[in-house]
Structures are given as C-alpha cells and as structure tokens.
C-alpha cells in the first residue's frame, strides 16, 4: 500500500482488547490486513479513515475495512477508552451464507464512505453486553472457554 505502513498482526480468527490509556504519541496513517472494529467509550478523539474525519462521541462504533488507510488523533490530556476487535477475513468468510454475510457492515461502510455508526444507547444494548462478555471470556480459564467464545459470536 504505497507509502503506508502495515501495523498489527493477527494470528487467530479474532482478537479483542479493552484499553484505557493516555496517548501522547501521534499515530501515522497505516493499514491492517484484517478488519477492525473500535467501540469508542471515552476521551477526545478524531478518527481518520480513507480521507474522512470523524470526531467521535461516546459509544460510536468505527468500522475499518481491511487495507483501509486510517489513523487516530487523541487528545493526550484525557484518558482514551475503547474496545478494539480484530477480525480475520477468513473468519468472516467462514460464516458467510445465503442468509447473512458478516462482511456486509464493512462493505456498506466502504460503499457509503461512512465508517462510524452512532448508537446513542449502545451501552444499554445487547450488542454491548455481548461484547463485554466476549471480552471477559478471553481472560477466563474455564473449561471449554474457546467454545463459549464461539457461542457468543453466534448470538
């Protein structure tokens, strides 16, 4: 991808992180070979995706398609809290059927040049609750934890 660096690697079907930090580093434009979803929780952040700028509001969902050029600009005086999900293209392809296609949200975001979903009541939604359960499942050492994670994805 001419002049842009590839950042991050994904060695599994998906990965989820819940991060809160104060970032003083300026991020350069970059891309990933996997899809990325960021659920913005708090801070003062602008997200840049494929030439568009999005000032984020709490609980915005940022959809970054694989190979999209993007970066984040963070106000270093405030904590930046977010949940990040990396999803491999192979994982999405494995769950594509005639009835549904998990890549639809990424394709629609790209087609409509609108990478942010603004859901004002997200923190009360079942999607947010499942995301939190999925996040916690990665730290669980319970029997069949990976099966539990897959069942959460199927919900």
Residue ranges and their predicted role:
Residues 125, 143-151:
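Short, solvent-exposed positions on alpha-helices
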